[in-house]
Amino acid sequence: NEWKNKQWSFLLGGRLDKHNLVNHIIFSPRANLRFNPTENVNLRITYAGGFRAPQAFDEDLHVGVVGGERLVTVLADNLKEERSNSFSVSADLYHKFGNVQTNLLIEGFYTDLDHVFALRQLDKPDAQGNTVQERYNAYGAKVLGLNIEGKAMFTRWFTLQAGLTLQQSHYDEAIAWNDEVPEQKYKKMMRTPNTYGYFTASFTPVKRFTASVTGNYTGSMLVGHSAGSGVEDPVAVHTPKFMEVNMKLAYDFPIYKYLTLQVNGGIQNLTNSYQKDFDKGWNRDSNYIYGPSLPRSY
């Protein structure tokens, strides 16, 4: 249900889900309060509950290779659904500086997680002799941070958009990421950078021609590196920062009425910001991959 007038709106709702791996019905509530003190200022407070079912994920369907042995993922017995309670406060601001239209969004967020999914390697292999890692319910976790996004339309042919997120992601209790090194325990969540952002610049000097420059920034993060060809013993690595810049040119050729042919070309990852320390050989860690998916490509 939603109640609103010109300045205020209040939305209250919920969702019921039934999953075949969960014995009970899951209720996820949500609430939203909006206040517009002026036409160009939008203030909002939001709460949302959510869940993630104890199921196999896409990455579980791919068999990894660690130290020359296959690694498969299984679900622990009595694995519970992961639950979340998320809160956010945001200010959405609009202003015009002469002919330049701008928009600034500032948002703070906090998420409390229960029955968080985590992975641990089991001592015994499966019937086929594969090394097995088990998805189980670890302790709770918290994610909080600040998101800032800005947009500006300088002219009809030039627009700029950029965003930056600062966040912290921690388990309530330290977790050993690899059973071979139980002393290496971390509260920090693996593969979650504290800083990441993006930008997009679009140029349309003539009607059918568009040039765009985009970028993605990924800050340093913690990634597990299992023993193999790269390292003798398992170690958690702090990755380097990455700044990926892409360029694209596009031109539209009208063919007939509503039919248009677009020809485009460009460079992906112009800065060649790419992982430098891949494992090699039969005993590599195939899961030790991070950062942009491609090197400089044309």
Question: How should these model regions be labeled?
Answer:
Residues 4, 25-27, 83-87, 140-144, ...:
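Residues that define the transmembrane beta-barrel architecture of outer-membrane proteins
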Residues 114, 217-226, 251-298:
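C-terminal beta-signal and adjacent terminal beta-strands/loops
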Residues 4-9, 109-112, 130, 134-227:
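Gram-negative outer-membrane beta-barrel transporters
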Residues 1-38, 42, 53, 64-65, ...:
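Signature of Gram-negative outer-membrane beta-barrel scaffolds
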Residues 7-10, 40-43, 97-102, 157-160, ...:
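Repeated loop/turn-to-beta-strand initiation elements of outer-membrane beta-barrel proteins
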Residues 32-34, 88-91, 291-298:
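Outer-membrane beta-barrel "beta-signal"
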Residues 36, 44, 78-136, 142:
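Membrane-embedded beta-barrel scaffold of Gram-negative outer-membrane proteins
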Residues 12-16, 31, 45-49, 58, ...:
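Transmembrane beta-barrel strands of outer-membrane/channel proteins
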